[in-house]
């Protein structure tokens, strides 16, 4: 079953609070990939608090070079090295030289057998990447073509594996419908203002993790000039991208708590389902 585990290690932005640290999200998928989305100050300690070794990370995906998103990276790299790991970092091109001086492997994208991660340009005040995750979740079967096959064979074929039944090898494409393969997508924006060009580039997603630095008490023009979004901006993005789930992070320290964001979220008729997590909250998402 395609299942994502998201642990919100830091849900604040720019200035930390005692209960709201700087941006960092741990993502673990059902295939075993472990990805840290941004590395705010203290990210390695927060990983350890939730039982994840920095050395076990598949990747760190950094959205841009502002300090609140990267100050946790040097310590994480050093700790991982001591533990025998090697950190690979996805980052915008403008950050590559600086990151290489840390001794990390720097990548522009990632491609494995069933997961692809690509940079999508967002609308911030500096060079910045949103990170688009696309999972290959297997074949959608044509039930007429698959008639008579045992359940175990159907399970393997759906996952993209060939099977042998009564001496005959059956490949997934032999019993696939015209739609062929199925994909599920998640987009993590990092910092961004409203960004129609990004929506057009991406198309549709299942899950959107979008910043909502401000609720509804700041003029939208001011937020946009700073390269940030309001609650309404994030909701507009989710609807443009046809997201089923919208998760709001990067909440300004001007808010003592997240009650206003949650009041606004409660007024939204799904889709999308809107979540405003606290630090250390865990969200399981079935794709």
From Swiss-Prot:
Cofactor binding notes: Binds 2 Zn(2+) ions.
Source superkingdom: Archaea
EC number: 3.1.26.11
Enzyme class: hydrolase
Catalytic activity: Endonucleolytic cleavage of RNA, removing extra 3' nucleotides from tRNA precursor, generating 3' termini of tRNAs. A 3'-hydroxy group is left at the tRNA terminus and a 5'-phosphoryl group is left at the trailer molecule
Residues at which Zn(2+) 1 binds: 64, 66, 124, 191
Protein's job: Zinc phosphodiesterase, which displays some tRNA 3'-processing endonuclease activity. Probably involved in tRNA maturation, by removing a 3'-trailer from precursor tRNA.
Name of the molecule in the record: Ribonuclease Z
Species this protein is from: Pyrobaculum calidifontis (strain DSM 21063 / JCM 11548 / VA1)
Gene that encodes it: rnz
């Amino acid at each position: 079953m395609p299942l994502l585990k998201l642990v919100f290690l830091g849900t604040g932005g720019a200035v930390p609070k005692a209960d709201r640290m700087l941006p960092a999200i741990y993502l673990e998928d059902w295939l075993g990939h472990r990805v840290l989305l941004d590395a705010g100050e203290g990210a390695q300690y927060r990983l350890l608090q939730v039982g994840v070794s920095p050395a076990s990370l598949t990747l760190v995906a950094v959205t841009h070079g502002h300090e609140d998103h990267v100050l946790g990276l040097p310590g994480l790299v050093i700790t991982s090295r001591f533990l025998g790991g090697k950190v690979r970092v996805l980052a915008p091109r403008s950050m590559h030289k600086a990151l290489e001086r840390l001794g990390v492997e720097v990548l522009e994208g990632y491609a494995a057998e069933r997961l692809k991660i690509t940079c999508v340009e967002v609308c911030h005040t500096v060079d910045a990447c949103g990170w688009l995750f696309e999972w290959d979740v297997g074949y959608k079967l044509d039930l007429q073509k698959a008639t008579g096959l045992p359940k175990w064979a159907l399970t393997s074929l759906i996952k993209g594996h060939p099977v042998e039944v009564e001496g005959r090898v059956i490949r997934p494409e032999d019993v696939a419908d015209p739609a062929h393969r199925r994909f599920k997508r998640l987009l993590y924006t990092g910092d961004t203002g409203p960004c129609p060009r990004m929506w057009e580039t991406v198309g549709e997603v299942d899950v959107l993790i979008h910043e909502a630095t401000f609720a509804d008490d700041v003029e939208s023009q001011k937020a946009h000039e700073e390269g940030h979004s309001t609650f309404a901006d994030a909701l507009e993005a989710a609807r443009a991208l046809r997201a089923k789930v919208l998760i709001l992070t990067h909440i300004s320290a001007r808010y003592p708590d997240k009650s206003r964001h949650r009041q606004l979220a409660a007024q939204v008729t799904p889709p999308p389902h809107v979540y405003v997590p606290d630090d250390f909250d865990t969200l399981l998402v079935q794709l």
